[in-house]
Amino acid sequence: MFRGTHRHSLDSKGRMNVPARFRDWLNAHCDGQLVVTIDAQSQKGERCLVAYPLPTWEKVERRIAELPSNNPAARQFQRLFVGQSEELRLDAQARILLSPNLRKFAELDKELVLVGQIDKFEIWDAARWDACQETWLSGADGFACLGDLVL
């Protein structure tokens, strides 16, 4: 579904092109509809947006709806993750318009990196992505905690 890292630019109106492989899948499976939201679990310095095909988002929403409403952390997560979400559709030029709120959260500048995450993709500011990637790659035993999960 969504694999690879793709560099794109954000235009002056806040629109970004979706990579050909991503848009082909989106058009074939969900008529170009997707939901973009904030990465509510990101740590400071690692803020990005997450884009879900609409059918995948609907499954995520159902799981979120099952969270206990009396749990303060669950309510806070839902407020951020669902409350900041925006339903979008690819335009005729295969672009999506990212709102000022979403762009502000992820501190998106002109250059972007789209990172495939199998059933969704992330939208990063290019400078932030490059810095984070360098940090992650330079970590000594950074992935050792995954044990047998790493293939």
Swiss-Prot record:
Q: Name one GO biological process term.
A: negative regulation of DNA-templated transcription initiation
Which subcellular locations apply to this protein?
Cytoplasm, Nucleoid
Q: Which InterPro entries match?
A: MraZ, MraZ_C, MraZ_dom, MraZ_N, MraZ_sf, SpoVT-AbrB_dom, SpoVT-AbrB_sf
Extract one GO cellular component term from the record. Answer: cytoplasm
Q: Which Pfam families match?
A: MraZ
Superkingdom of the source species: Bacteria
Q: What keywords would UniProt list here?
A: Cytoplasm, DNA-binding, Repeat, Transcription, Transcription regulation
Q: Which CDD domains match?
A: MraZ_C (cd16321), MraZ_N (cd16320)
Keyword set includes Nucleotide-binding:
no
Give the GO molecular function terms.
DNA-binding transcription factor activity; transcription cis-regulatory region binding
Give start and end of each SpoVT-AbrB domain: 5-56, 85-128
> What does the similarity note say?
Belongs to the MraZ family.
Q: How does it assemble?
A: Forms oligomers.
Q: Which NCBIfam families match?
A: division/cell wall cluster transcriptional repressor MraZ
According to UniProt, the name of this protein is Transcriptional regulator MraZ
Which organism encodes this protein?
Answer: Acidithiobacillus ferrooxidans (strain ATCC 23270 / DSM 14882 / CIP 104768 / NCIMB 8455) (Ferrobacillus ferrooxidans (strain ATCC 23270))
